[in-house]
């Protein structure tokens, strides 16, 4: 993404995946991973309980 000029606040539309067709502004650009974070699209992962972590949650 070195030459792509995405920046915070740009309005983008998702073209693939579970959120296909969703539009929203960019809230964060992750250039090292070639990804952007879009407002209104959930990206929170669930934490499963383990022996050390008995509390599960979001």
Curated annotation (Swiss-Prot):
It comes from the Bacteria. InterPro entries: KOW (IPR005824), Rib_uL2_dom2 (IPR014722), Ribosomal_uL24 (IPR003256), Ribosomal_uL24_CS (IPR005825), Ribosomal_uL24_KOW (IPR041988), Translation_prot_SH3-like_sf (IPR008991). SMART domains: KOW. Keywords: Ribonucleoprotein, Ribosomal protein, RNA-binding, rRNA-binding. GO terms for biological process: translation. GO terms for cellular component: ribonucleoprotein complex; ribosome. GO terms for molecular function: rRNA binding; structural constituent of ribosome. One of two assembly initiator proteins, it binds directly to the 5'-end of the 23S rRNA, where it nucleates assembly of the 50S subunit. Part of the 50S ribosomal subunit. Belongs to the universal ribosomal protein uL24 family. This is Large ribosomal subunit protein uL24.
């Amino acid at each position: 993404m070195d030459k792509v000029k995405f920046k915070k606040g740009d309005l983008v539309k998702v073209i693939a995946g579970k959120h296909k067709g969703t539009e929203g502004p960019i809230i964060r650009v992750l250039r090292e991973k070639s990804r952007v974070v879009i407002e209104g699209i959930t990206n929170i992962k669930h934490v499963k309980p383990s022996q050390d972590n008995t509390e599960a949650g979001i």
